[in-house]
Amino acid sequence: MYRNKEASWWPRRHPSRRRVPRGLEAWLDEPGSLTARLRRSVPGGLEVTVLVERWGRPSIDEARAVELSDGRHARIREVLLGSRDQAWIYARTIMPPEALAGDGRRLARLGRTPLGGALFRGRTVARGPLSIARLGPRDPLAARVPGGGAGCWARRSRLWYGNAGLLVTEVFLPPLLQSLED
């Protein structure tokens, strides 16, 4: 475990997992596209709401995770994924400039297209190790989530697309947990 301003991220098999709500473990461990899983689970069809899609400076922790030197900008994308009425997932993606070269150019302006749909469609994508966290009230990541993300579980991993890695962080929101209880 390492501590930083963002969150305390643990390897996915850390003992803290014993506190993960029932049913959420399968979502945290999803090895493939979370988008595909959402498409199967969200009633009425999956909707993507774009919150942010711009160039900017990732947090120090995020920059380290994608091996971006201090002060360099990356493409930052924040979206809500869920039904028309309720968000189930808040996702934040950090895309270094190298990830947007060549075939990756289309990732720079996805709009309402889910990242998973664009990445996993007929392409070879490798996922790095998954890390999990439970967001605290002072985590800047929790503050980015509309309505607040304190107490929510999150996962993050590096997705390798060609020679460059993206950092994808996904926060599991209360409506998803409610759907698991139904």
Swiss-Prot record:
Its main location: cytoplasm. GO terms for cellular component: cytosol. It is found in: Cytoplasm. It is an enzyme of class 4 (lyase). One of its GO terms (molecular function) is chorismate lyase activity. SUPFAM superfamilies: Chorismate lyase-like. Pathway: Cofactor biosynthesis; ubiquinone biosynthesis. InterPro entries: Chorismate--pyruvate_lyase, Chorismate_lyase_/UTRA_dom_sf. Substrate binds at R77, L115, E170. Keywords: Cytoplasm, Lyase, Pyruvate, Ubiquinone biosynthesis. Belongs to the UbiC family. PANTHER family: CHORISMATE PYRUVATE-LYASE (PTHR38683:SF1). Removes the pyruvyl group from chorismate, with concomitant aromatization of the ring, to provide 4-hydroxybenzoate (4HB) for the ubiquinone pathway. This is Probable chorismate pyruvate-lyase. It comes from Alkalilimnicola ehrlichii (strain ATCC BAA-1101 / DSM 17681 / MLHE-1). The gene is ubiC.
